[in-house]
Amino acid sequence: MELTPQQNKIFEQIKAFINSDASVFILRGYAGTGKTTMVKVIADYIAQSRFLALMAPTGRAARILRQKTGHNATTIHKAIYKKPRFDAKKVKDIAESEFKLIQDIFVPESGGSIVAIVDEASMVCSRKIEHELFAFGTDNIMEDLLTFVRPHYGGKIIFVGDPAQLPPIGEPHSNALRTEYFEEKGLKVVEAELTEVLRQQGDSTILKNAMMIRDLLKKEKRNNLVFEERKDDVETISPEDFLKKYLDHRKQSGTHDSVIICYSNGAASLYNRDIRRALYGAEVPLRKNDILLITQNNYRLDRMNGEFVPVLSVGQRLQLSAPVYTQIGGVTQSVSITLNFVQVMIPDSNGCPMLCMLLEDLLTSDKATISIDESRALYINFCIRHPKLRPGTEVFEEALLNDPYYNAIRAKYGYAVTGHKCQGGEWGKVFVDYTDRTGLNDDSLRWAYTATTRAQKTLYVTNLPHITPFSKFRIDPINKCNRIDPECRILNEVSSTPFHDLNVDNGVRAKYHCIAKNIENTPYKINTVISRPYLEVYNIQTPNGIDRYDLHYKAGAIFQLAKAVTPNQHTAIIKMILDEEREMSFKFDYSPSEESYSKLYNLIRSACDTISVQITNVVEHREDYSIVFYMRTSGTFSCIKIYVNANGFITYAKPMSLIGSEDRELGAIIEIINSHFI
């Protein structure tokens, strides 16, 4: 295999590393720079003289790695942990049954001669994650990986990954690709970086855009993000036509070499629902030819997290129930939990049809996995079905690990997936919806980079980040206004409250429901609410008595900040509960009527995304050539009125807030907007 000069240089570094006293080698490489080629060459070399452990964070990534290198590759979990064992508690009441699946760290017989290669290393978690029902080693997979390799006894580990991709969930950085992380542990580190895009991929518009995002991540000042487009390579699709384009491609290609990538589990669920409606004409249960995304490794069936499988046939459906003790309103109660299963035929890892059970409840849920109570119900139901098996025995554990229901496939519909779920995968045609990831902060850019680089041939995009400086644009200082126009928001219709019937203004009722949601799981309660003209009096029950708060509001039920009649030690927290309105549900559906408004919308939306501010409405006013962006900032409503002249030039903006220049979040948005023009 012919290597580029840069790859050859790094290969020589690897050879020197194997024979050195260094323990960790970090190989960083961006999209299109030949990381997989390097992994194969390195694996071939190491396998000649050392024990090679080739692994990846997900099952899908491990399977791809095995196919591309010709070496056996497994998930990190399968490589470093022993066969699971169960710690079960003996109980009299079956509903009290508890268990914990434990997998201890496996130490290979090869001892210090092991060399581990971890591909897709940006996904390796380095924080402790404890779970009520599972225990994997020390619950820190990075620490356990190092224990498995035993670097202090001569073992070595090579991390290969893309530093521009998303870090593990809940971590600001990918520590597997950070030299400082290992040096702080007393380990000697060698590092190298692949930066040259291979010649055959150099003309790819997809990679050009990826490199643009990569370069932005390296800059402190970020003021331009515009995707390059080219037909059949990178194409923009309007939100209205996005789903249709995806469905047309599926119909024409007859393959499953395409996917929609979006930001949240909720958005993925909506896309999957709409796609199935378009395919089958109604919200029908799982059926033949549906696509599933495996969400949890299943070693019994050899189907791995991140793999996509077609449904070959659908068989019998059945329900299993079990009593489980759970907390309801602070009281422990026994409830019956019912889980739904369906028998399906899917391809096994060799492509041959196999029958298995699928846990159907998870398919359409917005949750990433089943709840702890549902997991307990699975276990308790097994105990009910096998009353003669004694928990803690080898026979019990063997039966549980082979039970078709306890080990049922856990999956989501696989037409649309999140940015984290798509990591480690590639598709010929990828459809990316960048909604909520259009900011210039690191998180948004890494998400955009990860989603963008999943496409091998064609990238179709919608709600794309598009940020450019506007040469004639200026922004006035923030003005304090006495009122915000009622058009600032359109609320969804809300139900009555214990203190308001349906004749009361919808916004007043929405405010109550928002406060009621905020006050849950706190030591406070709403005692009474008294309605007066443009005033809601909330009497809040605290551990020390009842406190009164006055909530004045303007036309359209635009509430000002709450005022405590008698401030005390509870006031600060209660004011936060009363003022926070993020739980309010708005009808926000804006489509720009022309290009200038579209550019403005992308700019304002990006600024709001960056600091997590909610846009509540956008209104175009043709009579004075303006567009008004309304938003919820610093506990109150604010707006930015922007004027666009007849030629489409954006001239100036007037920001206004009910609290004037004290509106910190509006000020931050103005700073972000201004930064684009410096």
Enumerate the language-model features and the residues they cover.
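Short glycine-/polar-rich loops that comprise or flank the Walker A/P-loop
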Residues: R50, Y153-G155, L187-A192, H256, ...
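Intrinsically disordered, low-complexity regulatory segments enriched in Ser/Thr/Pro
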Residues: P543-D579, V628-E671
